[in-house]
Amino acid sequence: MKTQTVLIVEDDAWLAEQQIRVLEKNGYKAVSSPHAIAAIEAVDDEHPDVIILDVLLTGSTGFALLHELQSHTDIAGIPIILCTNLASDMKLDDLNPYGVKRILDKTTMEPSDVVAAVRSVLL
């Protein structure tokens, strides 16, 4: 069985590194991109099985990236986990059309929450 790949789109390098570490410890290949342009390139290069996306990115919002990803039929099916400080303001039902399967609240999440979210969307 091939190792599943997780793309982390996060402009906080420390947080991205923490997520990479916990995902790799749990058997996933994890790569990160600090902004939307690098994320598009990483999707093309890595063909991730799931994307963890910060909503508030430097230079572009996660929502702009969601729109971009959904405009490409070959990658529109990649499940998205939003990771944000704004989780209480978002409804999963409103974001489902954009491929969002889970929303993680950065203000309360633990490393194990990231792994659990990835597992749940890859079932």
Locations of the language-model features?
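Short hydrophobic/Thr-rich beta-strand motif most characteristic of the beta2 strand and flanking loop
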Residues: 27-34, 42
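Non-catalytic signal-transmission and effector/linker regions of two-component phosphorelay proteins
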Residues: 1-5, 110-123
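Acidic catalytic/metal-coordinating carboxylates
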Residues: 35, 61-67
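Active-site residues of response regulator receiver
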Residues: 54, 84
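Charged docking surfaces used in two-component/phosphorelay signaling
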Residues: 17-25
